[in-house]
């Protein structure tokens, strides 16, 4: 059921925000295809966009350059729109090794992937929301331009049930099998169902914590209700329900059969070509692999790598763009590209890398030529499909500057914070000078970001600072997304004072505690020291009232000059605003919260809690007990362990067993 977008916030637009909202909304209503929101760090770009969405009342897709920023934006939008559908659509792979062939060493690398079940559920929830509700905001990464199942086929496969319907139980079970749900009478999990007499319990693939109960009386649907799959408690009765498929790649049976006919025709043509070219090994390989896939599709309705036949499954012609998340959007949707100076080049680069890999697979008989149409969108195709667009960036790139019909500036921060003061200091003494600056900041409980040009320099610097009793960490490209978020969180909490990095301390890092940004070798002109990179890096200190940026350089390059001039322009605009409205700058106060749900565990009561905190709390509880109480607690835990084992819940039983061993080893020794 759709509602109107309703923004919930204790803040009202202030500073440059009211005029920016007004201009963006007017631009959308006037039909401008592209607009740019040029917003300085800490000016409230997210809040401005949220207000614009509320005013235009249009479903919105927001593209982010990486999962970290997508999670940050998702958390903020959920706070702003608690009553609306705010969804998250990113790649569901924790690990992904694409199928590839290396001719030089005759090495075939099979596709290998580990899918994150929770993110898969969120992706399915996103497409469900956008098809059912107008009040939907989806936060996505470039995953949104990769091929997804055809929306028409997907929507044809929905299972609709209404109270009073005449339908045979076998027919419902057959439809669930077509939706790729599996029967599991022991444990009800996502995308499974169980049958108990005339009652069918279904756990929808897109649902996080609600299952569906279908009660039949003979061949009539007598009752439909939602229940908690963990406790079995009934939540509410409903007059009708819709069950969505387990995957975006489900296809009606008749379409599968016509797909097999088309694959046969293409296979015959391709085998003939390979035979004429005397590529007999490739011919045999292709025939064997394709026939195996066809057999699987005929029997099960899918096969491993079914996406390679997506041209036929979605009924497209050769070379036509694949269906993507953008095809699921309604006609009046709005597209917002955050950190556009990074996201736009990403969108442009996806197609080429994918194409090169697949051409090798086709040439050596691992795939049919139609597999080349299982691909991300080309940039020109993305442009044609994209609805009205707003770019967001503190440093818009050349594409945005060229395309935008209007640039809306957001230079004034409501907090009164002025762009960091910039100083240029000589390179010769940069390390020792920086060390003395760090000690000053650490004494005031403030944090420091240091950016270097090379990995070696970052490592050496970290080692040097550690020797001088500085609490320092080094952020490098080998650190995964969740760990990176944890390091930034520790920096904010004061676990350490200095974070050293290369190109990782840029877009969207929201760390109000940072009062100093040091850029080493700032005069080495190049990508890492371009005007945009310098503005973005210096902006990390713009959320603190004592913000300062030190550029270590022996000369002022053109990039430095332009970056410093832009910072000065922004400082003048902010100072004039502060003077006019009698504002005293204040540092941004922001609670340190978890933004990535993967770093948390879901408890039975529906709350997310930090895993480490959970263990620490448990331990402190047992330490406080007397030996008698501890023995009683151990007996209780043993009963719990046997109960899980009797119910075949072996994972839960193992977890309780480990807890018992931990108490016996650690805590009982301490007590003795």
UniProtKB/Swiss-Prot annotation:
Entry keywords, A to Z: ATP-binding, Cytoplasm, DNA damage, DNA excision, DNA repair, Excision nuclease, Helicase, Hydrolase, Nucleotide-binding, SOS response
GO terms assigned for molecular function: ATP binding; ATP hydrolysis activity; DNA binding; excinuclease ABC activity; helicase activity
Extent of the signal sequence: none
Protein's name according to its UniProt entry: UvrABC system protein B
Gene this protein is translated from: uvrB
Subcellular location: Cytoplasm
Organism, scientific name: Coxiella burnetii (strain Dugway 5J108-111)
Motif (Beta-hairpin): 92-115
One Gene Ontology term, aspect cellular component: excinuclease repair complex
Domain Helicase C-terminal as annotated: residue spans: 430-592
Highest taxon of source: Bacteria
Subunit structure: Forms a heterotetramer with UvrA during the search for lesions. Interacts with UvrC in an incision complex.
Family in the record: Belongs to the UvrB family.
Lineage of the species this protein comes from: Bacteria, Pseudomonadati, Pseudomonadota, Gammaproteobacteria, Legionellales
């Amino acid at each position: 059921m759709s509602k109107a977008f309703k923004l919930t916030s204790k803040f009202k637009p202030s500073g440059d925000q009211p005029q920016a909202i007004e201009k963006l909304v007017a631009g959308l209503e006037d039909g401008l295809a592209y607009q740019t929101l040029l917003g300085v760090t800490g000016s409230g770009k997210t809040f401005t966009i949220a207000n614009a969405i509320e005013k235009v009342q249009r479903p919105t897709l927001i593209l982010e350059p990486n999962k970290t920023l997508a999670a940050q934006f998702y958390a903020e939008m959920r706070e702003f729109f608690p009553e609306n559908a705010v969804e998250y659509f990113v790649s569901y792979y924790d690990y992904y090794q694409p199928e590839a062939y290396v001719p030089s060493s005759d090495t075939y690398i099979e596709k290998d992937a580990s899918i994150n079940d929770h993110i898969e559920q969120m992706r399915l929830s996103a497409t469900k929301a956008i098809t059912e509700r107008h009040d939907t905001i989806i936060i996505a990464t470039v995953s949104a331009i990769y091929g997804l199942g055809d929306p028409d086929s997907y929507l044809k496969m929905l299972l609709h049930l209404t109270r009073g319907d005449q339908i045979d139980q076998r027919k419902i079970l057959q439809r669930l099998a077509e939706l790729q749900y599996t029967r599991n009478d022991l444990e009800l999990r996502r995308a499974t169902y169980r049958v108990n007499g005339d009652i069918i319990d279904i756990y929808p693939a897109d649902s996080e914590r609600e299952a569906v109960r279908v009660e039949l009386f003979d061949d009539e649907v007598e009752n439909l209700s939602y229940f908690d799959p963990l406790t079995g408690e009934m939540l509410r009765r409903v007059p009708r329900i819709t069950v969505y498929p387990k995957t975006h790649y489900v296809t009606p049976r008749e379409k599968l059969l016509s797909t097999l006919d088309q694959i046969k025709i293409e296979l015959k043509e391709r085998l003939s070509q390979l035979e004429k070219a005397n590529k007999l090994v490739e011919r045999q390989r292709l025939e064997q692999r394709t026939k195996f896939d066809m057999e699987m599709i005929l029997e099960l309705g899918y096969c491993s790598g079914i996406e390679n036949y997506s041209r036929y499954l979605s009924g497209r012609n050769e070379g036509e763009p694949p269906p993507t998340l953008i095809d699921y959007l309604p006609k009046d949707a709005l597209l917002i590209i955050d950190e556009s100076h990074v996201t736009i080049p990403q969108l442009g680069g996806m197609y080429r890398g994918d194409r090169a890999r697949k051409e090798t697979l086709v040439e050596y008989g691992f795939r049919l030529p139609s597999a080349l149409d299982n691909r991300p969108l080309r940039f020109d195709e993305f442009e044609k499909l994209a609805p009205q667009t707003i770019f967001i960036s503190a440093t818009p790139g050349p594409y945005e500057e060229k395309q935008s019909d209007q640039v809306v500036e957001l230079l004034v921060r409501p907090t009164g914070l002025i762009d960091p003061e910039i100083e240029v200091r000589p390179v010769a003494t940069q390390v020792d000078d920086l060390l003395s600056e760090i000690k000053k900041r650490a004494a005031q409980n403030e944090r420091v970001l240091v950016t270097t040009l090379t990995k070696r320099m970052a490592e050496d610097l970290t080692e040097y600072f550690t020797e001088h009793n500085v609490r320092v960490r080094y952020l490098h490209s080998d650190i995964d997304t969740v760990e990176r978020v944890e390091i930034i969180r520790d920096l904010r909490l004061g676990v350490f004072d200095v974070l050293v990095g290369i190109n990782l301390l840029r877009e969207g890092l929201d760390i109000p505690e940072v009062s100093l940004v040091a850029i080493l070798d700032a005069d080495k002109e190049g990508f890492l020291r371009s005007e945009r990179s310098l503005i973005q890096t210096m902006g990390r200190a713009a959320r603190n009232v004592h913000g300062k940026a030190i550029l270590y350089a022996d000369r002022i390059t053109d990039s430095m000059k332009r970056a410093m001039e832009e910072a000065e322009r922004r400082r003048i605009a902010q100072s004039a605003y502060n003077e006019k409205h009698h504002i005293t700058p204040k540092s941004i106060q922001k609670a340190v919260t978890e933004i990535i749900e993967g770093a948390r565990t879901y408890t039975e009561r529906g709350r997310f809690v930090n895993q480490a905190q959970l263990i620490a709390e448990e331990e402190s509880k047992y330490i406080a007990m007397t030996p008698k109480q501890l023995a009683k607690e151990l007996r209780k835990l043993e009963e719990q362990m046997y109960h899980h084992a009797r119910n075949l819940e072996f994972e839960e039983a193992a977890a309780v067993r480990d807890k018992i061993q931990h108490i016996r080893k650690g805590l009982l020794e301490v007590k003795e």
